[in-house]
């Protein structure tokens, strides 16, 4: 079939297999061209491995450090008449490249929040790796089913204390308007913590520890976005921010639980990037479009793969990591520089519908959004007839 993007609201409902492969190969080429840290991981578990920062972590581990990887994800396979999800095609492309390089890459498709998938992962680690020395936790989900009680928790993107009305870039209509978001109630705050907080990261690390599959000196990271004043009302100081604070609690608990292994758990603060998750958050399309304008002009912008390649080199495997006052790895320091934030704020305050293209780099934002789904990639023939049916090797 000929596959063109089908965009509904802030999501694209299909994906292009050839485009996704080209996008993954771009990231692999970037990592191969970099100078990696002298030390690095050998056996890596990536929980949330198919898109964004999780995929970038898997690529960096394999093609920067020749590490074996086990990837956990929950993706929709293709059929004869419907495309699979972007994450499905991304993983198929990654595994194909790893196979060609002769580097182990195994995959589990299922609900990472469940006991069943944790048990499957442990079984695979015992059989093929023995132990893992790096665990990357990079899940984004609107819901989580409690594996013990069966209760379904839901996350919300709401402010705390009082409702917020703020400027917004409506990507469907391509206009600057306002968005109003009601304040969360206590149940919504707790639900967001239960989904996006550190509980499942902790469950994973406890299960791995009890099974004896964590290596001496094991490292684990969970990814977060902190942001600054512009994004705090609906992000950093809102329900999702409370959930991210719970990651700090979990990091402390995991450090205590892995002390006998000299383990290290750190939350990692990363840049705002265009992902399937961030595109759903009010204010983020406008913020990121303005940030693109500033940081690309400065030559300092880093996407997922640049951020993660540098995270491994500058922080996870560095003797002098850059930490914030909470002990998190700070990989977002360029974005949060005062001079950058001031110029982004100036754009934010000035932009209207007529000046979107002049003042922001919404064009780049939209291009990045399409690339998530394999569209708009140089060298890909989007008029060609392609089969949507692509298999993932080494999938259980």
Curated annotation (Swiss-Prot):
It holds the Pfam family Eno-Rase_NADH_b. It catalyses: a 2,3-saturated acyl-[ACP] + NAD(+) = a (2E)-enoyl-[ACP] + NADH + H(+). NAD(+) binds at residues 48-53, 74-75, 111-112, 139-140, 244, 273-275. Pathway: Lipid metabolism; fatty acid biosynthesis. One of its GO terms (biological process) is fatty acid biosynthetic process. GO terms for molecular function: enoyl-[acyl-carrier-protein] reductase (NADH) activity; NAD binding; trans-2-enoyl-CoA reductase (NADH) activity. The record marks 75 as: Plays an important role in discriminating NADH against NADPH. Keywords: Fatty acid biosynthesis, Fatty acid metabolism, Lipid biosynthesis, Lipid metabolism, NAD, Oxidoreductase. The active site is at 235 (proton donor). Its EC number is 1.3.1.9. InterPro entries: Eno_Rdtase_FAD-bd_dom, Enoyl-CoA_Rdtase_cat_dom, FabV-like_NADH_b, Trans-2-enoyl-CoA_reductase. Substrate binds at residue 225. Coiled coil: none annotated. HAMAP family: FabV_reductase (MF_01838). Involved in the final reduction of the elongation cycle of fatty acid synthesis (FAS II). Catalyzes the reduction of a carbon-carbon double bond in an enoyl moiety that is covalently linked to an acyl carrier protein (ACP). Belongs to the TER reductase family. Monomer. This is Enoyl-[acyl-carrier-protein] reductase [NADH]. It comes from Colwellia psychrerythraea (strain 34H / ATCC BAA-681). The lineage of its organism: Bacteria, Pseudomonadati, Pseudomonadota, Gammaproteobacteria, Alteromonadales. The gene is fabV.
